[in-house]
Amino acid sequence: MNTLSYKTISANKATADKQWIVVDAEGHNLGRFASKVAMLLRGKYKTSYTPHVDCGDNVIVINAEKINLTGNKLDEKTYIRHTGYPGGQRSLTAKVMQQKNPALLVEKAVKGMLPKNKLGAQLFRNLNVNVGDAHKHAAQTPKAVNLNDLK
């Protein structure tokens, strides 16, 4: 019996098989979509997944303006930020944010589902969200993935 075959293989930056993936946001619900994109960024669908390493894929999201928000979330969901000055709390509804910058709506949802540490910041840099179906990463020959096929 070969005992070397029972070693646990841990991925590192050099051995991570990172690919470029295009995902279409049209017709998807925001939270469910963001959850699957976060799993792709994290690399959890790969057999070589290692929790402390950036072994996920680079994800390009297209048609960010066509994402769905269910129920009354478009009018009632608020995004709160603070300027840093006293009394500087500002808020936007999802409807206003979708009109101003629909890509930011998807980015905030995905970022909230990534780890809140250095690794999460590094993983978030692998996300590219685009309004419309055009993107500037054609040179990387990204592979189109249907999120309905993923669990």
Named regions from a protein language model:
Residues 1-107, 118, 136-151:
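Ribosome large-subunit tunnel/peptidyl-transferase-proximal elements
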Residues 133:
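Flexible, active-site-proximal loop/turn residues at the rims of small-molecule/cofactor binding pockets
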